[in-house]
Amino acid sequence: MLINFLLVGFGASLGAMLRYGISIFVKSKWKTDFPYATFFINITGSFLLGFLVSTALGPMWQLFLGTGFMGGYTTFSTFKVESMELKWKANFQVLFSYVGLTYLCGLIAAFIGIMLGV
């Protein structure tokens, strides 16, 4: 049982570090109201998680990669906070684009990941 917690924790720490690195890199390249870093992270995360859940990985790999790594990598809470910040700035065009594209592209990416993993 302890090994399961360690697998999830180690995977999450690696995923969070990758998310942080990507976020820093993207924000240094693109200065815009659209939150490209979080968008990229969540779309690639949707694809990767879709792929992982459709493969024949063992339960320990699912814990490490699916629950841990992908849980640390993707960020639903940042998506919501950035959405609220856009609302508070009354930047509705970017807000609706961000929310709509995140949900639409996330579903498509997860579907493609699942299809490729089967």
From Swiss-Prot:
Recite the UniProt keywords alphabetically: Cell membrane, Ion channel, Ion transport, Membrane, Metal-binding, Sodium, Transmembrane, Transmembrane helix, Transport
Q: Which domain of life is it from?
A: Bacteria
Which residues are recorded as binding Na(+)? G71, T74
Alphabetical GO CC annotations of the entry are:
plasma membrane
Q: Where in the cell is it found?
A: Cell membrane
Keyword Cell membrane (UniProt): yes
**Anything known on activity regulation?**
Na(+) is not transported, but it plays an essential structural role and its presence is essential for fluoride channel function.
Q: Which reaction does it catalyse?
A: fluoride(in) = fluoride(out)
Q: What biological process terms from GO does the record include?
A: cellular detoxification of fluoride
A Pfam entry, by short name: CRCB
**Membrane topology (UniProt):** Multi-pass membrane protein
Q: Which residues cross the membrane?
A: 5-25, 39-59, 61-81, 98-118
Q: Which GO terms describe its molecular function?
A: fluoride channel activity; metal ion binding
Q: Write down the InterPro entries for this protein, in alphabetical order.
A: FluC
Major place of residence:
membrane
Summarize the protein's role: Fluoride-specific ion channel. Important for reducing fluoride concentration in the cell, thus reducing its toxicity.
Record-stated family: Belongs to the fluoride channel Fluc/FEX (TC 1.A.43) family.
Annotated PANTHER family? FLUORIDE EXPORT PROTEIN 1-RELATED (PTHR28259), FLUORIDE-SPECIFIC ION CHANNEL FLUC 2 (PTHR28259:SF16)
Please identify the protein, giving its name as recorded: Fluoride-specific ion channel FluC 1
Which species is listed as the source?
A: Listeria innocua serovar 6a (strain ATCC BAA-680 / CLIP 11262)
